[in-house]
Every structure is written in structure tokens, then in C-alpha cells.
């Protein structure tokens, strides 16, 4: 009888140990015996590295971004007023000498003017009867007309010359990224601006980051806000495009916020063209969990960059107390920024319930061991 009882004891111990392991949820990893690299700031005080601001109507008003207003762009207006197209290699010119059809290339019934015009050669010249090669690259139409007129005067009395461009093929700007029709756009005798180029490309896609468009001109990058330009009429964001310019519209992958904690659906949310408010973020996460959340502990954690980070602070934390439902008005006015973390804390009673749930397997295991031991004793 005693031997049978002893044989059952290892089984009871195993049941107890397995049940006890469930007290600590999730996985854990010990650093003992591992090569831990010491850090100079290992003893940092996290409380001193953040700023905590209770959300108030006044604070929200201070944080509210000031709207861009419609402003003229005098520099752009001057550039457009003085704009002149200069011919480049590959362009096709049409030269007309009035009352001299033998010098005027006829387009013909089935041929376009670009097919029958005068091609500008790679060496920058084009050929014209009587006067031979004419250097045209880098010149305006008025300069080319004057040159041809002067040289034809040797052969024709008082020549009446007209020059126009049949095909613009030498100079291009490039539109890429999140537009509906990316590709190259010809620089013509009509000035091409950023707004013109975006419209010609079919507009922006739903995944475009219109706040951080990149214009590369002469090897230098400049950030352009199409939001300010297209939504608020800030013409200072518009630019004249020149040959070789690249306009890149990035994806909005970086325009996201994170909703964590006691919400019904923890999520990573993408911001759309109009941005996102705290209320929208909580709504997209299907709201806070009313059974486990602490309505007074809704936090927005905003990482600090630049000057804030250099002052030893790593984040600003904004706290919203939603125990009074009227505070949703403030949440609606509080605009989130990319990489904000919205965190909803746990209510104290919920933490107690979770502790009980974690202890139940152990309690059950101990009870099972006790009952089994009693059965063995009475066996």
C-alpha cells in the first residue's frame, strides 16, 4: 500500500509545478549567464525624461496647428512673366518664309508638322536651304527668327520669317511616386508649375503623403506641402519646373498612429489627407473597453525630436480624463501627429480580476493535489 502511494507522489508534484507555471503569463527570458553590455545611462530616471500635460481647452488651443492662409507667390509670378522657352537638341522647328513656298516645308495632307519640320541635331544645329547650318540650341524663337532673317536677306529681299516649335522633345521634368499617372512631362513654351504637373499626372492617389512632397532641382531637395498649396491656397508652395527637375510624392506609410492598451481593437492606424483626431483614433479602435479600462487614464505619448530631444526629454505625454463624457469635445479637437501612441490604462479592479484569473490554475492545482493526497491516504 505504501509503495503505491510513493509511486503517485511524482505525478502530484508534476501537476503542481505545471499548474504553478501559469501564474506568470507569457514568455520570459533570463539574462543570467549572458553577456550584458553595460550602458553609460543605464541608471536613467524615466520620470524625468518626459513631460506630462493634462489636456485642457487652453492647451488644445495652443497645440492646434495654425491654418495656412492663401498667399501670393511674387517670385513665381515674376518667373512666369519672364519665362522664355529655349530650344534644345531633339526639338522640331517649323520655319515659314512668306511668299516663298519653295523655302517653306509643306506639311502635306497626311503628314504632321513634326514629321516634316526641321530637327535640331545633337550638335545644336539645324539645316535650312541657302543658309546651311543654323545654330539654334539655347536660343529663343525670337533669336532664331532674327538670325534666319538676317542670313536669308543675302538671297531674298526683305524676307518675312516665322519660326515655331512643332514638337517639344528636348526638355522634360519627371513626376513619380503616388500619382495616378507617373512619368515624364515635356517642358514647353507654356510654363509648367508643380500644380500643373500634379494635375497632368491625374492627381494624387489615396496613399500619397501630400505634406512631404520632394522637389529635386539642380541636385538639391526641397520639401513641398501640397496640402498647404491645394487645400489652403498657399501659392508659396508652388514652383516653376525646369528641365531635369524631379517631383516625388512619397507614400503615407509614415503617417500612422498606434492605439494600445484597454481598447477593443489594438491597431496601427494610417492618417488620411485630413489627419486624425484622438476621437477618430479611439473610434477606429472600436472604442475603449468599458469593463477593463480606466477612463481617466487615456494618454497620448508623443516622441520628441530636435530641440526637445536635445534637452534630455524623450516624449511629451498628454492625459485625457474621459470619466466625464463631455471631455470627448476636447478629444475631437486634439489632433494627432505621426507616430503618436494612444494608450488606455487598465482600471484597478481589472488588474485585480486579472491577478485572480492568473492564480486560479495554481489554486486549482493545489486543491487537486490536496484532494488526491487525501484519496491516497484513504486508499
Swiss-Prot record:
A lipid is attached at residue 21 (N-palmitoyl cysteine). This is Putative polysaccharide export protein Wza. It comes from Escherichia coli (strain K12). Keywords: Cell outer membrane, Exopolysaccharide synthesis, Ion transport, Lipoprotein, Membrane, Palmitate, Polysaccharide transport, Porin, Signal, Sugar transport, Transmembrane, Transmembrane beta strand, Transport. It is found in: Cell outer membrane. GO terms for biological process: colanic acid metabolic process; monoatomic ion transport; polysaccharide biosynthetic process; polysaccharide transport. NCBIfam families: PRK15078.1. The gene is wza. Its main location: membrane.
Amino acid at each position: 500500500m505504501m509503495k503505491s502511494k510513493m509511486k503517485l507522489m511524482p505525478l502530484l508534484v508534476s501537476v503542481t509545478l505545471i499548474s504553478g507555471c501559469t501564474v506568470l503569463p507569457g514568455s520570459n527570458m533570463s539574462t543570467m549567464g549572458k553577456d550584458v553590455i553595460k550602458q553609460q545611462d543605464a541608471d536613467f530616471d524615466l520620470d524625468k525624461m518626459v513631460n506630462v500635460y493634462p489636456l485642457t481647452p487652453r492647451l488644445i488651443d495652443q497645440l492646434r496647428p495654425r491654418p495656412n492662409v492663401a498667399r501670393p507667390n511674387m517670385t513665381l509670378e515674376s518667373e512666369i512673366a519672364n519665362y522664355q522657352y529655349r530650344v534644345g537638341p531633339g526639338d522640331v522647328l517649323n520655319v515659314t518664309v512668306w511668299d516663298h513656298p519653295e523655302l517653306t516645308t509643306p506639311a502635306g495632307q497626311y503628314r504632321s508638322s513634326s514629321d516634316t519640320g526641321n530637327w535640331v541635331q545633337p550638335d545644336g544645329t539645324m539645316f535650312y536651304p541657302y543658309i546651311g547650318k543654323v545654330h539654334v540650341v539655347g536660343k529663343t524663337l525670337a533669336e532664331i527668327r532674327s538670325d534666319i532673317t538676317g542670313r536669308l536677306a543675302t538671297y531674298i529681299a526683305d524676307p518675312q520669317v516665322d519660326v515655331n516649335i512643332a514638337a517639344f522633345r528636348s526638355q522634360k521634368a519627371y513626376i513619380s511616386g503616388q500619382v495616378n499617372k507617373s512619368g515624364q512631362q515635356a517642358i514647353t513654351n507654356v510654363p509648367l508649375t508643380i500644380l500643373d504637373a500634379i494635375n497632368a499626372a491625374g492627381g494624387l492617389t489615396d496613399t500619397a503623403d501630400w505634406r512631404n512632397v520632394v522637389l529635386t532641382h539642380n541636385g538639391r531637395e526641397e520639401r513641398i506641402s501640397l496640402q498647404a498649396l491645394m487645400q489652403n491656397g498657399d501659392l508659396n508652395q508652388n514652383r516653376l519646373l525646369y528641365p531635369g527637375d524631379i517631383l516625388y510624392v512619397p507614400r503615407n506609410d509614415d503617417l500612422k498612429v498606434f492605439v494600445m492598451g484597454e481598447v477593443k481593437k489594438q491597431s496601427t492606424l494610417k492618417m488620411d489627407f485630413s489627419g486624425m483626431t484622438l476621437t477618430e483614433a479611439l473610434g477606429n479602435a472600436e472604442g475603449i473597453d468599458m469593463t477593463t479600462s480606466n477612463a481617466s487614464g487615456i494618454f497620448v505619448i508623443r516622441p520628441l525630436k530636435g530641440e526637445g530631444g536635445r534637452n534630455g526629454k524623450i516624449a511629451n505625454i498628454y492625459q485625457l480624463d474621459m470619466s466625464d463624457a463631455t471631455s470627448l469635445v476636447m478629444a475631437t479637437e486634439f489632433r494627432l501627429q505621426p507616430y503618436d501612441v494612444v494608450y488606455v490604462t487598465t482600471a484597478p479592479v481589472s488588474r485585480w480580476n486579472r491577478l485572480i484569473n492568473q492564480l486560479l490554475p495554481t489554486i486549482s492545482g493545489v486543491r487537486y493535489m490536496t484532494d488526491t493526497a487525501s484519496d491516497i491516504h484513504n486508499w
